[in-house]
Amino acid sequence: MARRREQVLDAALEVLGSEGARRLTYQAVDTAAGVPSGTTSNYFRNRAALVDGLVDHLLTLEHHDWERVTAGAAPTDVGELADEVTRFLRHATGPARARTAARFALRLESTARPELRAALARGREAATARGTEWLRHLGSATPRRHCEILLDHLDGAAFRQLTFPADDFDPRPGIHGLLNGLLG
């Protein structure tokens, strides 16, 4: 039962991220998930419940992503950190493109549904906590503030790549330059 719910939520993220909020319907999710008609509505009785489920599911997936990224040894210099962050951003705008677009769509949804902000903020805080430790390890005088600046840059770079895709997308020079400026 839990696996079917996860299958529905994965499909809903794909629909939201690939086709936009207007296409996030029970029928579209059922079709994308390859499940019988009515399955999504059995788990989520209305659109608000589906969106709430999407936020929770997205946070779980992103938590696992950050655990994978931070599982190894902490970067020992700016170059290593730039490489790690670049890999993450390329993944977010490549294989995980729909999920990243869905995250932005859910953030926009929070302008109409402020109650979503707390959960979305928890996800951002988890990323900030991990990044802050890396930046502290590299000698940042204000690691939390520097991490917030880095995450804002990554959001902007991801948003640009999602909305105006460049075939030659190479975020590393910008990331490396930003980190050098912060950690200088």
Where are the regions that the model predicts?
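Helix-turn-helix
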Residues: 7, 11-53
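Short alpha-helical scaffolding segments that buttress acidic/His motifs in well-ordered protein cores
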Residues: 88-89, 103, 107, 150-157
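Hydrophobic alpha-helical connector segments
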Residues: 53, 64-100, 147-150, 172
